[in-house]
C-alpha cells in the first residue's frame, strides 16, 4: 500500500473544513503516511496543484473559516476522460488514497475515483446539512449560529418599529437551516420546500400575530422557493399595511470562525477517516449519527434523497404562532 494520501475540499466552502484538513494531515503523519494537499478541489488534480502537507502551515488553520486549500465546483469531472486523467495524475505522484471533504457532488466525484481504483474516504462538509445518514455535516452548526445571530439582531430593530422581516437562508433543497433557525429564534412563520405559502396566506398570518399584540413578526424562508424576495416582502406590506423588510442572509453563512462543535466534529471524522485508510478501506463515507461516528458506503449515501421533516415544520409554525 502506498503511503501517500491526498486531501481535498470541494464544492461550497463550509466552516470547519480547515479543522478537517489539519487533523487529516496530523493523523496521517502519526500513522506513518505522507499527506498531500490538493488545491481547489477536483480541478486541482487535473491542474496538478498538489503539494506535500509538510510544505504548508496546516497546524495553524483549524480556527479559520473557509478552506485554506481552496475549493471549486468542477462539472467537467463528470466526464469519464477527466476522471481517467485524474487517476493517471494521482498514480504518477504515487497517491493511492484520497480523503474528500464536501457535499453530494464531492461524494459523487469520490465514488467515481473509487470505482477506478483510488481508495476514497468522504467527509460531509457543507453548511446545508443535506447529506444522508448523518445528523450533522461539518459547517452546519456554525452557519446556523450565524443565522440565529442575524435574526436576533433583526428582531431587536423589528420590535422597535413594529415591523415584519422576511429572511431568506441557504440550504439549497434542504430545509434544516431554516427549520432549526426558526426553532432557535421563535420565527413566527416558516416557509420551506415542504410548506410553501402564498403572499396572501403569509399576510393573513402576519395580521393575526400583530392582532395578538406581538411587536414584530419574522418570516424565515429556505432559498430556491421565491422568485423574488423583495417583491414577496413588498406584497406582504401592500396587503397588511405593516412595514415589511427583506433580508437575504447570503454568503455570511459560509464564513466565520467555526464553532467548537464543528471543529470537534471535523477532528473526529478526520481521525476516523485515517483509521479506515490505515485499514486499507475505500468507498466509505463518515457520518455522525445517533451520537456516534459511523461509516456508510458512499454509493448508498448518494443514492438516497434528502430527508424531509415536514411534520416538524408544521409543528414549529403552530407553536411559534402562539
UniProtKB/Swiss-Prot annotation:
Localization per record: Cytoplasm
Any one GO BP annotation for this protein: fructose 1,6-bisphosphate metabolic process
Annotated InterPro entries: ATP_PFK, ATP_PFK_prok-type, PFKA_ATP_prok, Phosphofructokinase_CS, Phosphofructokinase_dom, PKF_sf
Sequence positions that bind ADP: 155, 186-188, 212, 214-216
Binding-site residues for substrate, renumbered to this chain: 126-128, 163, 170-172, 223, 245, 251-254
Pfam families in alphabetical order: PFK
Activity regulation information from UniProt: Allosterically activated by ADP and other diphosphonucleosides, and allosterically inhibited by phosphoenolpyruvate.
Cofactor names: Mg(2+)
Biological pathway: Carbohydrate degradation; glycolysis; D-glyceraldehyde 3-phosphate and glycerone phosphate from D-glucose: step 3/4
Xref: SUPFAM superfamilies: Phosphofructokinase (SSF53784)
Residues annotated for Mg(2+) binding in this entry: 104
GO cellular component: 6-phosphofructokinase complex
E.C. number(s) listed in UniProt: 2.7.1.11
Active site: 128 (proton acceptor)
Enzyme class: transferase
Alphabetized UniProt keyword annotations: Allosteric enzyme, ATP-binding, Cytoplasm, Glycolysis, Kinase, Magnesium, Metal-binding, Nucleotide-binding, Transferase
Positions of ATP binding: 12, 73-74, 103-106
Entry function: Catalyzes the phosphorylation of D-fructose 6-phosphate to fructose 1,6-bisphosphate by ATP, the first committing step of glycolysis.
Family matches, as HAMAP family: Phosphofructokinase_I_B1
Protein name: ATP-dependent 6-phosphofructokinase
Organism: Mesomycoplasma hyopneumoniae (strain J / ATCC 25934 / NCTC 10110) (Mycoplasma hyopneumoniae)
The encoding gene: pfkA
